[in-house]
C-alpha cells in the first residue's frame, strides 16, 4: 500500500516563524507552501522550496483568503467566483515563479483554511478554485478533502486529484471536518493519532465523532506542522505506517 504524507509549511512571515519546517520536511513527502495571502513572503517561499528540493519533497501551492491577521481562517462574506479565481491563480503563479527561481516544480494545489472549508460545502467556491487551477496549469493535481464538494468540482474540471484525510482532525457525520471552534476538533495525542491514521489508510474510511464509518478514497494524509508536538506526531505517523508495510511516497510520483 502506498500513501503520501502532506504538511502545510512556509507559514511564517518576515521575522516570525510558524512551526519547525526543517524537521517536518524530513518526514513529509509533499508540502503545501503558503503564497503570501494568509502567510508566507517571497523569502520564506524561496527558502521552503529550496529545502523541499534538497529533501526530494513535492511542492504545492497553498492559496488562502487575503487575511494575514486571521491566518486565512476567516470566511470572506460576499466574495464572488471571479474574485476567488483571481486570488487562487495569483497565488499559484507566485509559487511557480519562486519555484522556477529555485529550480523546483509545483506539482499540486491545496486550498487553505477558510477557503478550503467553504469550498468543501459550497459548489460555487469549489468550482472557482478548480477553474483557477485548470486555467493556470491543467496538469496540476488538486488536493481535495475526500467526499467533499471539492471532489465534484475537480471531476467537473477534469483535474487529477489526490483525496485527503487529516491525521489530527475529527470528522462530522457528513464527512466534513469538525470546526476548530468546537471542542475536540483537533487531536493532540501522538500515539492515538498514529493508530488512527493506520486504521484510516488500511480501511479506506474515517470514523466520525458519533462513531459513523465513512468510506472514502485516501491518497494523502495531512499532518499539521503548527500544532503542539507536531514533529513527534508526524514522525510517529510515518513510523506506524511503515511498520505496517506502507510505502510513503509523494502522490505526484505514483
Curated annotation (Swiss-Prot):
Q: Provide a GO biological process annotation.
A: carbohydrate metabolic process
**What Pfam families does the record point to?**
LamB_YcsF (PF03746)
> Keyword annotations for this protein?
ATP-binding, Hydrolase, Nucleotide-binding
Question: What Gene3D superfamilies does this protein's entry cite?
Answer: Glycoside hydrolase/deacetylase (3.20.20.370)
Gene Ontology MF term list? 5-oxoprolinase (ATP-hydrolyzing) activity; ATP binding
Q: Which EC class is this protein assigned?
A: hydrolase
- Catalytically driven reaction(s): 5-oxo-L-proline + ATP + 2 H2O = L-glutamate + ADP + phosphate + H(+)
Write down the SUPFAM superfamilies for this protein, in alphabetical order.
Glycoside hydrolase/deacetylase (SSF88713)
Q: Looking at the record's lineage, which domain of life comes first?
A: Bacteria
Record-listed E.C. numbers: 3.5.2.9
- Record CDD domains: LamB_YcsF_like
**The keyword DNA damage belongs to this UniProt entry's keyword annotation:** no
Q: How does it assemble?
A: Forms a complex composed of PxpA, PxpB and PxpC.
In terms of PANTHER family, this protein maps to:
5-OXOPROLINASE SUBUNIT A, UNCHARACTERIZED PROTEIN YBGL-RELATED
Q: Which family does it belong to?
A: Belongs to the LamB/PxpA family.
Any idea what job this protein has? Catalyzes the cleavage of 5-oxoproline to form L-glutamate coupled to the hydrolysis of ATP to ADP and inorganic phosphate.
Task: Name the chain's protein.
Answer: 5-oxoprolinase subunit A
Species of origin reads Rhodopseudomonas palustris (strain BisB5)
UniProt gene name = pxpA
